[in-house]
Swiss-Prot record:
Chief place where the protein resides: plastid
Pathway annotation from the record: Amino-acid biosynthesis; L-tryptophan biosynthesis; L-tryptophan from chorismate: step 3/5
Enzyme Commission identifier(s): 5.3.1.24
Taxonomic path: Eukaryota, Viridiplantae, Streptophyta, Embryophyta, Tracheophyta
Originating species: Arabidopsis thaliana (Mouse-ear cress)
Reaction(s) the record says it catalyses: N-(5-phospho-beta-D-ribosyl)anthranilate = 1-(2-carboxyphenylamino)-1-deoxy-D-ribulose 5-phosphate
GO molecular function, one term: phosphoribosylanthranilate isomerase activity
Protein name: N-(5'-phosphoribosyl)anthranilate isomerase 2, chloroplastic
Length: 275
């Protein structure tokens, strides 16, 4: 996938006529492109991540498709449905102001179901400090923590050295990013997730106008925001993210519990897309 997020070597493409970059695909294949020229009077920026103590790759399951994160899971039952359908990540809202918020004890039960099914449990945090997030992650047996809001994002540089992190970027309706990743630590994040300005609302943004920023993470990037079974194929085809995140798009009529038929339809639509 030709995006600005890679896992090994990153070059600001404006400085080159062509570039050399190594990119791990979802099928565990490595694609390389060779540099053929350098544009004069432009700066070249290159950074290579330290290969020591690298967190495990989330694409090692070798599936030739985008990875799937099902978020806003509120019960072990819904987690089991999601895992059985093929979800790679099970997301839980650890934020009291969300209608899909759950307690740490329920989160621990969900984490157990996720891990037993081969999925990774993710805790979603909004405006919490690093100590609060670390305590909750330990208590709930989370694999990754997802950082929303300026408060939680401010703790990124401290958290990323202790926990696997999904760093959230928000885009407005026109597809313009409203925040950025700290450049000095962005390569330490496991994933970059691009969401709408109001995550979990079911509202998306203009995919056609969105431009992926030149940032990198260990695994790549996830797309969220207004995704559902009827539009996920279009979203994947336009932006070709490494993974897709769905929450309200697979909910039942109460907007909280997950709907089995919607989960099935969503997975079927995702599996119909191959990059």
């Amino acid at each position: 996938m030709s995006t600005g997020i890679s896992t090994d070597l990153h070059v600001h493409f404006g400085a080159l006529n062509f570039s050399k970059t190594y990119k791990s695909g979802l099928s565990n294949r490595t694609v390389s492109f060779s540099r053929v020229g350098y544009a004069q009077n432009r700066k070249l920026s290159c950074s290579v991540s330290n290969t020591e103590n690298v967190a495990p790759k989330d694409d090692e399951r070798g599936k030739d498709r985008p990875l799937v994160k099902m978020c806003g899971i509120t019960s072990a039952r819904d987690a089991a449905m999601a895992v059985e359908a093929g979800a790679d990540f099970i997301g839980m809202i650890i934020w009291p102001h969300s209608k899909r918020s759950i307690s740490l004890s329920v989160a621990k039960d969900i984490s157990k179901v996720a891990r037993e099914g081969g999925a990774k449990p993710v805790g979603v945090f909004v405006e919490d400090d690093d100590n609060t997030i670390l305590r909750a992650a330990d208590s709930s047996d989370l694999e990754l923590v997802q950082l929303h809001g300026n408060g939680s994002r401010a703790a990124f540089s401290r958290l990323v050295r202790k926990r696997r992190v999904i760093y959230v970027l928000n885009a407005n309706q026109d597809g313009k990013l409203l925040n950025e990743v700290p450049e000095e630590d962005c390569h330490l994040a496991d994933w970059i997730l691009v969401d709408s300005a109001t995550g979990g609302s079911g509202h998306g943004f203009n995919w056609a106008q969105f431009k992926l920023p030149s940032v990198r993470s260990r695994n790549g990037w996830l797309l969220a925001g207004g995704i559902n079974p009827t539009n996920v194929s279009e979203a994947l085809s336009i932006l070709q993210p490494d993974g897709i995140d769905v929450s309200s798009g697979i909910c039942g009529t109460d907007g909280i519990q997950k709907d089995k038929s919607k989960i099935s339809s969503f997975i079927t639509a995702v599996r119909s897309v191959h990059y």
